[in-house]
Amino acid sequence: MSSRKGLYFLRPFIFSPLTKKETAYARFFSAARSISRREVIRVTARSRHPHNAAVKAQPKIENDYDAAVAELSHSAANEGRIQKLKEYNALRYPRVSRHGNRMSIPKFRHTFENVTTSAPASEEVLLQGRIMSIRASGYKLVFMDISGDFEKVQVMISLNNVPVDNPEEFKRTLHPLLRGDIVSVTGTAMRTSSGELSLKATTLPSLLSPCVAPLPKKLINEETRILKRHVDLLVNRETADVLRLRSYIIKYLRDFFHERDFTEVQTPLLADYAGGAAARPFLTSATEFPNKELALRIAPELWLKRLVVGGMNKVFEIGPAFRNEGLDATHNPEFTICEFYSAYSNLQELMAMTETLIRGLLEHTKLLKESKLPTLDIAELAEPSEDNWRQVEFVPALEDALGIKLPNLSDPDAHEQLINLLEGKSRLPPVELEGASLNRLLDHLASTHLEGDSLTAPLFITHHPACMAPLAKSFACPRTGQLVSARAELFVAGREIANMYEEENDPFEQRRKFELQVLSRRGSGEEGDGGEEGQARVDESYVRALEHGLPPTGGWGCGVDRLVMLLSGTPRIADVLSFGSLRNVVSLSQVAKK
């Protein structure tokens, strides 16, 4: 049996023909491997083989890893730093070894908080972190501050306390260390004469990852802070605190719902139709469905309500959504949304639950500022008290603000009537809203004349016209006679925080509302590619799901990014996203190509 046949017998898959996808993956994997140091050395050795004439013709490269280092030093303008590390044989990136008493810096500070100047600890521990400052006191004593897990500790390295053969070894180990380097050091806890908890090194520090690019003391330029977010996080504590607050808020939301017996679920991001909100979707395609246009979800609402139909009476989801719309201080095309649906809940219960949630989050944020997130700026947020949560009804409040009596907003020509009334009062909407649907026009009027009242206290705007909430139950308002929805929006400090309503569970009424929505979009010329209000069609699949019976259900949605903005006191949505807005992310890619 030949060796090849033997291999086939043992490993038949080696000789199986590859598909196109597998071939492409193999090429990618081969290319990725080729940049490793081991592969470079192997290829270099082959290039020297006398029988490899094809490779022999290639320019001779002694070590491609060195070439990569040379390219880095040129592009980063830090050749001197790299040469110094080479000189001290410190340009290394070693693997970490297991240590029985490795501690995080926060745990070290907590464990040894009672150590005194006269009674240092005897237990040896290993700390790892990034050098934020380093200073020498003569040639026998060096101090450094290392940070990790958002806390710092001082390390004292004395020639008299570490095992070295001679002072030159002490110098050669410490001399190449700079701010930004990542090190590990073993020692015992002590407190200095000034009362500072420190680690007294019993071994010389080991360099785990040198910082070959200079680490600034501070970043101020906003564009640079976003484009170099990793540096911003290292030098600006407030940036990290905002992102950490985001994590705490999401955890608080999850705990809040779990404590109330909600089930967390995940619903599709990609489907053949994006419904659940009035927004233009991102459209794409998939190789499995070459002739079908797909869309990224704009909201998880319709999926979640299908689960309620299926008997999951309390569900919630926290996840991404995508809307192909404008980008400004409070909007980003990619954002995080939280929605919950609770069977047998009405609008008043949803509003009460919202108030409880926001109050709890405010208190939680204050405690975090006092304990873990000291740089948060939440002082300007007016604290809601028991009696200052206001409620206004949409139609009466807007009529008072405009000084007009709104037409019957259910009439087919309501849009034209409203435009004529606004023209008579010299309150025509801006040019960009010409041709907008009645829904968008009413939304603009509310944002201009009603939402500002939330600057001094939280404001619920309730009972929007039915045309503004086609997925909500509707009823005739006894006060105005208008057909309105069982809906409320919460605004705090001028920002929309949450949207909630009693869900339409009548399949026949839901179909009628979908059809009216389609007609409205066609009338305003916004149907085509989705316009500003998204795709318009009757979602037959959802209507059929309702035919199996959706119990009376309350639904609620909140933009997590805006919630973090509110609680952190940040003015821009980019500040609460790990790498800024979509504009920042795209700019980052463009800068990398230059």
How does the language model describe each region?
Residues 2-594:
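Class II aminoacyl-tRNA synthetase catalytic cores and aaRS-like
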